[in-house]
Design a protein with these regions (language model features):
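Conserved, mostly hydrophobic/aromatic
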Residues: 50, 76, 172
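Conserved SAM/AdoMet-binding glycine-rich loop
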Residues: 81-229
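Active-site mouth loops of central-metabolism enzymes
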Residues: 69-70, 227, 231-232
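Short cysteine/histidine-rich metal-coordination sites, predominantly Zn2+-binding motifs
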Residues: 71-81
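Acidic, low-complexity intrinsically disordered segments
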Residues: 1-71
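Basic, glycine-/proline-tolerant helical and adjacent loop/strand elements
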Residues: 32-34, 66-73, 101-114
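Auxiliary Fe-S-binding modules of radical SAM enzymes
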Residues: 1, 205-207, 213, 235-238, ...
Length: 253
């Protein structure tokens, strides 16, 4: 019987793999044909929830989902192979509040869980090993996690650059450079952490790929109208962008 409950990882994978070869894919107008492939991008849900489930950003729904539920690399790779069988070429790894905390260590104990490079590498290389894969892009990154754990984050960044298609973006949710907004909304990334993370991504990701685009760049998110905001907030945001530009760092958007 149906009830209001959180799905398990096993249920999630069962339905996702069934959907990979369903009419939602095979009858999609953007799928195209074998001779003339269309632009369809198949988005995979990698995990749900956020590692900040105990005290996450006040405006966000993700912490309400509780402890993150991760799907295994093998389950996701199987789903994407089924999608390839149905004619899909392009894939985006979605549903991730932070690419760097996929199967991270210390999620229950730490404010900044430690990134685990092995599972995400297994997933990305497993997907890229299929010659049918065209474009591969990913989802968000938490700059504070990257800044607090530079060594494992650098290893993950190298893997992303090796396996993703050029033009890939890691969305960084700074939301605001204003300390008052930061405190009022329980944000966990400050401008110094942000710049540290941007430097790391630029170190490896600003090289250009075969299509002429930088391999991997940060995308910077701001939110207007948050608690604690003032006219000065916008000047702080602008000053931060000027600092990033003066340092010669690249952003995708």
């Amino acid at each position: 019987a149906w009830s209001h409950q959180r799905r398990t990882a096993e249920q999630w994978t069962e339905w996702a793999q069934a959907g990979a070869s369903s009419k939602a894919v095979t009858d999609h107008p953007d799928l195209g044909s074998e001779k003339r492939p269309g632009p369809l991008t198949y988005e995979v849900e990698v995990y749900q929830g956020c590692v900040r489930y105990k005290r996450g950003c006040k405006f966000c729904i993700e912490p309400k989902k509780g402890i993150p539920i991760w799907r295994t690399p093998e389950d996701i790779i199987k789903e994407v192979r089924l999608a390839h069988d149905a004619g899909v070429h392009h894939v985006r790894l979605g549903g991730m509040t932070d690419t760097y905390t996929y199967m991270a260590d210390g999620v229950r104990e730490l404010e900044y869980p430690v990134p685990n490079p092995e599972p995400i590498a297994r997933l990305l290389h497993g997907l890229r090993d299929d010659e049918r894969l065209g474009v591969l892009h990913t989802d968000n990154g938490n700059p504070s996690i990257i800044a607090e754990h530079l060594e494992p984050s650098e290893e993950i960044t190298k893997t992303l650059v090796e396996t993703l298609s050029d033009g890939a973006v890691l969305s960084f949710g700074l939301e605001s450079a204003d300390p008052s907004v930061h405190e009022a909304n329980w944000l966990n990334c400050d401008p110094d952490q942000l710049k540290s993370a941007i430097r790391l991504i630029n170190k490896h990701g600003r090289v250009r790929g075969e299509r002429g685009l930088p391999k991997l760049l940060p995308g910077l998110n701001f939110i207007a109208g948050l608690n604690g905001e003032s006219k000065e907030t916008y000047q702080m945001n602008l000053d931060l962008l000027h600092d990033i530009r003066r340092e010669g760092l690249l952003l995708r958007r």
